[in-house]
Amino acid sequence: MAKRDYYEVLGVSRDVDGKEVKKAYRRLAMKYHPDRNPGDASAEEMFKEATEAYDVLSDDQKRAAYDQFGHAGVDGNAGAGGFGGGASFSDIFGDVFGDIFGGGGGGRTRANRGSDLRYTLDLDLEEAVRGTTVKIRVPSQVECKSCSGSGAEKGTQPETCGTCNGAGQVRMQQGFFSIQQTCPRCRGAGKIVRNPCRSCHGSGYVEEQKTLSVKVPAGVDTGDRIRLSGEGEPGVNGGPPGDLYVQVAVREHKIFTRDGRNLYCEVPISFVDAALGGELEVPTLDGRVKLKIPEETQTGRLFRLRGKGVTPVRGGAPGDLLCRVVVETPVNLTKKQKDLLREFQTSMEESGGQQAPKKHSWFEGVKSFFDDMKF
């Protein structure tokens, strides 16, 4: 079943601010919370749907990705712009209702998947069309060797949090609500570090640069993403790592522009070739090909070279190369050349406009326009 629009789910317009998004979610969460609707599967689904919508629309980066790409931009707890790790229902609900039940919904309360990361990969058009393999260097959080990931100074150990007894969560009861909240003392870690490691400052991780090999499939275009599973941030409390999303950005080409599977280029020709016709070589990504120019060709005419475009990344027939002719006006003429052109112009005028029909038609239209004007 297709997902509903997140703005529709919360009953808000697309231009509302974060406060209105939060207000709409509070209203729906109070109405459909499972503790208020025991055994009602429909209410539970409505609650989950509202929570999912709030998770995206309350985050500026996720919301921007959703506005641009729809559900595809935020599926898998990742968006085209933010790529934050996914939050659990209890985290989100605690964030919204923490002021009611005491304590905010800060850190993660259980084993959570690590955050996704994004890397922008600049490619030449030829690389994007043919495919390539590139090496990239990205920052990575790795386990601190000094403390073996405990976050505590060597020779010491973290203590079990006495507030939550190591669970990382405390249960709050208010009326018909019974909600697990992140422990305010240990922030969900379940442990307290009395003597933080000086290398990682108590986090258990240090940042290093790592080199990854990225296989770029043929046919990718700007905006396409390549997913490297498990290469994101490390998980929290034993959770799995996130993913690294490599986003493609194709550099501007000096000859070709791309539109989907088709390529476009401009081909300058002399006015003699335009008038008399001829044959010239034009570039393609596979080499040079002959292009026949018929006589009386005008600027702007498109010539299609079938199959000389791009094969889509998901397969299918290759596109075409469309060459747009631009008739070039000669410059730096000699006196003799100018005299010949004046002689040619005189002969053109004697033809009564038959050899320049567009020009003749335009001037006739202008003359008629002024004749019809009343002064």
UniProtKB/Swiss-Prot annotation:
Specify where it is mainly localized.
Answer: cytoplasm
Highest taxon above the source species: Bacteria
Q: Name the needed cofactors.
A: Zn(2+)
Give its localization: Cytoplasm
A cellular component term, taken from the record's GO annotations: cytoplasm
Q: Name one GO biological process term.
A: response to heat
Sorted alphabetically, the keyword list is: Chaperone, Cytoplasm, DNA replication, Metal-binding, Repeat, Stress response, Zinc, Zinc-finger
For this protein, the record's InterPro entries field holds: DnaJ, DnaJ_C, DnaJ_domain, DnaJ_domain_CS, HSP40/DnaJ_pept-bd, HSP_DnaJ_Cys-rich_dom, HSP_DnaJ_Cys-rich_dom_sf, J_dom_sf
- Which positions does the entry assign to CXXCXGXG motif repeats? 144-151, 161-168, 183-190, 197-204
The entry describes its oligomerization and partners as: Homodimer.
**Family listed:** Belongs to the DnaJ family.
Q: Which PANTHER family match?
A: CHAPERONE PROTEIN DNAJ, DNAJ HOMOLOG 1, MITOCHONDRIAL-RELATED
Could you identify this protein by its name?
Chaperone protein DnaJ
Organism, per UniProt?
Hahella chejuensis (strain KCTC 2396)
